[in-house]
Amino acid sequence: MESVKISQLPKEKVSKLIFNLIAPRPVAWISTVSKEGVVNLAPFSFFNAITTKPPLLMVSVGKRKDGSLKDTSRNIKETGEFVVNLVSRELLEKMHLSGKDYPPQVSEAKELNLELEPSLIVKPPRVKASPASLECLLRETFQLGSTPMDVFIGEVVAVKYEPYLLSSQKGLVGRLGGKRYCVVDCEVDLSGI
């Protein structure tokens, strides 16, 4: 086992440690719509629930390599709406490909032939094949880190989901380190203890 002081490591090593040790992480496959009406779809794994009353979640979005805003950040800041689509094994490859650096005027969903459907409340559509989609209104945003990450707090205002997810999350995808993912295929139920 190794022990290290974070302050003595280069940034790249710190990132590698965090990405590989805090795993698996749930994946938020976020759909947004630009002011021009272009649907953006991109995956983020710095994501989780915060509270249930009200139902709040957070997602942290980095910058492009040139330091400019990613489409997801820009769209959420401009419109105040986004949809978190959960990812099943069947959607894994397309989800991964949607993380490439597409220009703002290009819809990842259209490029990857992903079928979308209208949301119940917010303007961004949901990925039709997603087993669950959480429609969110932006409640708060702030920046953290020396290379500032946009942290968005969204209130879940509508949900569309497959009923089986209330008793089993088998088949859902999580993010590991690097370009590796995991799929839930084993659940341990301790309710009898």
What spans do the regions from the language model cover?
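Basic, polyanion-binding surface patches
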Residues: 1-193
